[in-house]
């Protein structure tokens, strides 16, 4: 997910995206805790995507 794609979305769409990413992060953490997660780099990718979405939401709210 690129930041340029996210800037074109509305705040409502970004909030929906954020909710989906948080759910995905939860599922990945549960898989990691039970030893089922083989691609541990996915945790890092999702965490950074959450940060991207939150940053753009904050910038749009301030504008």
Curated annotation (Swiss-Prot):
UniProt xrefs under CDD domains: Ribosomal_L29_HIP
Q: Pfam families given for it?
A: Ribosomal_L29
Cellular component terms, GO, for this chain's entry?
cytosolic large ribosomal subunit
GO BP term, pick one:
translation
Concerning PROSITE patterns, the annotation shows: RIBOSOMAL_L29
Tell me which InterPro entries the record gives: Ribosomal_protein_uL29, Ribosomal_uL29, Ribosomal_uL29_CS, Ribosomal_uL29_sf
What SUPFAM superfamilies is this protein classified in? Ribosomal protein L29 (L29p)
A single Gene Ontology MF term assigned here is: structural constituent of ribosome
Q: Which UniProt keywords apply?
A: Ribonucleoprotein, Ribosomal protein
Which protein family is named in the record?
Answer: Belongs to the universal ribosomal protein uL29 family.
Full protein name: Large ribosomal subunit protein uL29
Task: State the organism of origin.
Answer: Shewanella loihica (strain ATCC BAA-1088 / PV-4)
Taxonomy of origin reads: Bacteria, Pseudomonadati, Pseudomonadota, Gammaproteobacteria, Alteromonadales
């Amino acid at each position: 997910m690129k930041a340029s794609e996210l800037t074109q979305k509305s705040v409502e769409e970004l909030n929906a995206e954020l909710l989906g990413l948080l759910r995905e992060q939860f599922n990945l953490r549960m898989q990691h805790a039970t030893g089922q997660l083989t691609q541990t780099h996915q945790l890092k990718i999702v965490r950074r995507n959450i940060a991207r979405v939150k940053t753009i939401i904050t910038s749009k709210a301030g504008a």
